[in-house]
């Protein structure tokens, strides 16, 4: 089970990541936004696998109508994701956010 502190630790261990508020929530930026707390216990990350993740584990990965126009964003329930999986998600999100 991951926590917001785990997210912070992993994000800030990645190259050139900064933390600041976005829409009143903690967020982490590479060149662009790479991760943001959506609400308590739910994290937004960038991925190329949104449909696969949500299709295989909908209790962990999902999106809302707000995210329909952003197919690279997925929401993650932190209490359902293992630490190693969280790290993989954040590393991919970092790569995607660093490309711009």
Q: Where are the regions that the model predicts?
A:
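Charge-dense, helix-prone N-terminal extensions
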Residues: 1-100
């Amino acid at each position: 089970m991951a926590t917001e502190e785990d997210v912070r630790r992993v994000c800030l261990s990645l190259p050139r990541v900064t933390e600041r508020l976005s829409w009143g929530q903690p967020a982490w930026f590479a060149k662009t936004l790479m991760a943001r707390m959506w609400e308590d216990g739910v994290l937004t990350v960038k991925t190329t696998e949104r449909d696969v993740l949500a299709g295989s584990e909908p209790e962990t990965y999902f999106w809302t109508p707000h995210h329909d126009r952003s197919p690279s964003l997925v929401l993650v329930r932190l209490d359902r994701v293992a630490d190693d999986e969280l790290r993989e998600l954040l590393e991919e999100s970092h790569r995607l956010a660093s490309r711009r």
